[in-house]
């Protein structure tokens, strides 16, 4: 009704105002209502057992992705009418929310590598992550890339040298990882010792050591004992030169090595010595030489190769380059502004030391860094006010980047700690594997020796002795099979060899002791797999039947249970674990135990005379179950 009214109402209104005449024909059919979403358009996504439901139109908003394209049909299961994905359901929640809201977020508690794998699987690019999470995502990804690179470098300079490595690669590996060999470790400690000696000598040679004969003024130790310090400096420089040349020759890329920071430090540390050897005694040149000797202090940076803390500090400063640049730029702006203000504020004072704006730079730097030497102080009230503001602003400007630097240092430090821990765990794991292999080999050889000794003792007729030896893995599995069959079928199983011996000796059916096929039933042997009952004696059915009589032998798939009347119950089971018919009466008053013959395939044994061992006789009886060991 409402639909019909809605159809002709526009025509009636138009005719009333004279826009168009009333239609003479029949009214048009009412417009069809938009088909509502039915259950057919509801898609069920099963992600590792977790069910997600969403509309098909929601997924088809992004046809370039896996869920939005027809490729998702490859994961459809008609039986369950679900799309099954063997992926992480926790990360999939965020991916499905992207289809719903159009905003992709990064879960901070998830692994960055697993998150990237899920995005790649479902066809999403990381660039669509929202602005609220993108910066943290990039930081985590950069940290993970650095960690993987460190692990790769560690693996390349691992503990074990590859047999295909050249001499050049071995030398470079020894420099980068001194713990790979004894010679590399010795050279590592020798260079560290000479670095310390060089730095100490550079400091001690400036200490006054008294006046020499003919001089009133005290001379420094470097001038009074010039020969000793020169020899010491020569020895240190020779060691540093040899190290630098070896590193240059063994470097994978000499161009990159020469441009590296540590290479420049090495050159600056040894260059003043060689310049001093070729310089003349001219006073002007001597003054320049004194200036060059200042660069010897850079030898202390060579300790960075020997100190993990210094390397972490260098990595921190490198990773905080943007923050340090912002700090330097902010300080420069503040220094220029406050130096200009202080100069004009103190310009009217006659005793003011702020003679120019560059002269006020010193006061501004000292004040903003909260040092306050007191050599330059403002005299006017305006100067004191602006000086206080300068001091407070310096605290704020310097304190802002400090937490970022500290967090980066902590992050890099913990990364190195985890890397060291992983290397230690890997080393311990390899040591355990080597020990296990060595122990297994020793145990195997010992078992072989025990087996040979046992065979020799058993073959000796003069000194018969019983020597217990542990069975092979095949025998262990065989006895375990017997134990499981006994527990499953309530039948007693006997080896075929034992059964043959018992049938051949009819008079000794009730033997005082028998060789049980189980490891645990052997005297002096303790089973580690399963414990079977040790039978002092067992009853063998149809023991009085001659061995030449050929009887019927049952297969394991058919097990007959007999009672006192010996009435066979025709019941077969294709599996030992299958349930039997309820009509089968298992608990008889006097059960008759079915005996099984366990056949272990053994190679034919040749007697000393050269004849082969005769075949095993066939045995009759309907109560015999033959079980093949294979």
UniProtKB/Swiss-Prot annotation:
A motif (Selectivity filter) lies at residues 370-375. Pfam families: BTB_2 (PF02214), DUF3399 (PF11879), Ion_trans (PF00520), Shal-type (PF11601). Residues 474-489 are annotated as: Required for dendritic targeting. Residues 1-184, 250-256, 308-321, 404-630 are cytoplasmic. Keywords: Cell junction, Cell membrane, Cell projection, Ion channel, Ion transport, Membrane, Metal-binding, Phosphoprotein, Postsynaptic cell membrane, Potassium, Potassium channel, Potassium transport, Synapse, Transmembrane, Transmembrane helix, Transport, Voltage-gated channel, Zinc. It is a multi-pass membrane protein. Phosphorylation at Ser-438 in response to MAPK activation is increased in stimulated dendrites. Interaction with KCNIP2 and DPP6 propomtes phosphorylation by PKA at Ser-552. Phosphorylation at Ser-552 has no effect on interaction with KCNIP3, but is required for the regulation of channel activity by KCNIP3. Phosphorylation at Ser-552 leads to KCND2 internalization. Phosphorylated by MAPK in response to signaling via the metabotropic glutamate receptor GRM5. Phosphorylation at Ser-616 is required for the down-regulation of neuronal A-type currents in response to signaling via GRM5. Residues 207-226, 282-287, 346-357, 378-380 are extracellular. Residues 2-20 are annotated as: Interaction with KCNIP1, KCNIP2, and other family members. Detected in brain cortex, hippocampus, dentate gyrus, thalamus and cerebellum. Detected in neurons from the primary visual cortex. Detected in the supraoptic nucleus in hypothalamus, in hippocampus and the habenular nucleus of the thalamus. Detected in the bed nucleus of the stria terminalis. Detected in dendritic fields in the hippocampus CA1 layer, in stratum radiatum, stratum oriens, stratum lacunosum-moleculare and stratum pyramidale. Detected in dendritic fields in the hippocampus CA3 layer and in dentate gyrus. Changing residue 71 to K: Abolishes interaction with KCNIP1. Its main location: membrane. The keyword Ion transport applies. The modification Phosphoserine is found at residues 438, 548, 552, 572, 575, 616. InterPro entries: BTB/POZ_dom (IPR000210), Ion_trans_dom (IPR005821), K_chnl_volt-dep_Kv (IPR003968), K_chnl_volt-dep_Kv4 (IPR003975), K_chnl_volt-dep_Kv4.2 (IPR004055), K_chnl_volt-dep_Kv4_C (IPR024587), Shal-type_N (IPR021645), SKP1/BTB/POZ_sf (IPR011333). Belongs to the potassium channel family. D (Shal) (TC 1.A.1.2) subfamily. Kv4.2/KCND2 sub-subfamily. Homotetramer or heterotetramer with KCND1 or KCND3. Associates with the regulatory subunits KCNIP2, KCNIP3 and KCNIP4. Interacts with the regulatory subunit KCNIP1; this interaction mediates the capture of both the N- and C-terminus of KCND2, preventing N-type inactivation and stabilizing the S6 conformation, thereby accelerating closed state inactivation and recovery. Interacts with DPP10, DLG4 and DLG1. In vivo, probably exists as heteromeric complex containing variable proportions of KCND1, KCND2, KCND3, KCNIP1, KCNIP2, KCNIP3, KCNIP4, DPP6 and DPP10. The transient neuronal A-type potassium current called I(SA) is triggered at membrane potentials that are below the threshold for action potentials. It inactivates rapidly and recovers rapidly from inactivation. It regulates the firing of action potentials and plays a role in synaptic integration and plasticity. Potassium channels containing KCND2 account for about 80% of the neuronal A-type potassium current. In contrast, the potassium channel responsible for the cardiac I(to) current differs between species; it is mediated by KCND2 in rodents. This is A-type voltage-gated potassium channel KCND2. It comes from Rattus norvegicus (Rat).
């Amino acid at each position: 009704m409402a639909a019909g009214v809605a159809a002709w109402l526009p025509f009636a209104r138009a005719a009333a105002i004279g826009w168009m005449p009333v239609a003479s024909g029949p009214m048009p059919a009412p417009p069809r209502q938009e088909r509502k979403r039915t259950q057919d358009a509801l898609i069920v996504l099963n992600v590792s057992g977790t069910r997600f439901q969403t509309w098909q139109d929601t997924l088809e908003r992004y046809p370039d992705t896996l869920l939005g394209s027809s490729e998702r049909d490859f994961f459809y299961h008609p039986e369950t009418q679900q799309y099954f994905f063997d992926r992480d359901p926790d990360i999939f929640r965020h991916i499905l929310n992207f289809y719903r809201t159009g905003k992709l977020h990064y879960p901070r508690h998830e692994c960055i590598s697993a998150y990237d794998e899920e995005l790649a699987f479902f066809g999403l690019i990381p660039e669509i992550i929202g602005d609220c999470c993108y910066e943290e995502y990039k930081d985590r990804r950069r940290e993970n890339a650095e960690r993987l690179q460190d692990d790769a470098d560690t693996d390349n300079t691992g503990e074990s040298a590859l047999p295909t490595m050249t001499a050049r690669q071995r030398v470079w590996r020894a420099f980068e990882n001194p713990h790979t060999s004894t010679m590399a470790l010795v050279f590592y400690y020798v260079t560290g010792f000479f670095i310390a000696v060089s730095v100490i000598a550079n400091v001690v040679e400036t200490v006054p050591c008294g006046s020499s004969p003919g001089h009133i003024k005290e001379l420094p130790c470097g001038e009074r004992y010039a020969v000793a310090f020169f020899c010491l400096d020569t020895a240190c420089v020779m060691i540093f030169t040899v190290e630098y040349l070896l590193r240059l020759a063994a470097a994978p890329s000499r161009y990159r090595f020469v441009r590296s920071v540590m290479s420049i430090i090495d050159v600056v540390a040894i260059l003043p010595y060689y310049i001093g050897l070729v310089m003349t005694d001219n006073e002007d040149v001597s003054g320049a030489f004194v200036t060059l000797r200042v660069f010897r202090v850079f030898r202390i940076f060579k300790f960075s190769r020997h100190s993990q803390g210094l390397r972490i500090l260098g990595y921190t400063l490198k990773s905080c380059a943007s923050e340090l640049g912002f700090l330097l730029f902010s300080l420069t702006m503040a220094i220029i502004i406050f130096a200009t203000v202080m100069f004009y504020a103190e310009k009217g004072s006659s005793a003011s030391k702020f003679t120019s704006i560059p002269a006020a730079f010193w006061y501004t730097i000292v004040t903003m860094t909260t040092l306050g030497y007191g050599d330059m102080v403002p005299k006017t009230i305006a100067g004191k006010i602006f000086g206080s503001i300068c001091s407070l602003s310096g605290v704020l400007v310097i304190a802002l980047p400090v937490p970022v630097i500290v967090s980066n240092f902590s992050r890099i430090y913990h990364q190195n700690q985890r890397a060291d821990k992983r290397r230690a765990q890997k080393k311990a794991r390899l040591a355990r594997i080597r020990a296990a292999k060595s122990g297994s080999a020793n145990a195997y050889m010992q078992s072989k020796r025990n087996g040979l000794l046992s065979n020799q003792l058993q073959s000796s007729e003069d000194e018969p002795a019983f020597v217990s030896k542990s069975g092979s893995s095949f025998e262990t599995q065989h006895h375990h099979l017997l134990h499981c069959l006994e527990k499953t079928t309530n039948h007693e199983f006997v080896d075929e060899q034992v059964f043959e011996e018992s049938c051949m000796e009819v008079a000794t059916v009730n033997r005082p002791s028998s060789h049980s096929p189980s490891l645990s039933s052997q005297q002096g042997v303790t089973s580690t797999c399963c414990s079977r009952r040790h039978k002092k004696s067992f009853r063998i059915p149809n023991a009085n039947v001659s061995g030449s009589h050929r009887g019927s032998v049952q297969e394991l798939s058919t097990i007959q249970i007999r009672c006192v009347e010996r009435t066979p119950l025709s019941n077969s089971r294709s599996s030992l674990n299958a349930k039997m018919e309820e009509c089968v009466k298992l608990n008889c008053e006097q059960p008759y135990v079915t005996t099984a013959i366990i056949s272990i395939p053994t190679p034919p044994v040749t007697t000393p005379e050269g004849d082969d061992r005769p075949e095993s006789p066939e045995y009759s009886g309907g109560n015999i179950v033959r079980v093949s060991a294979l």
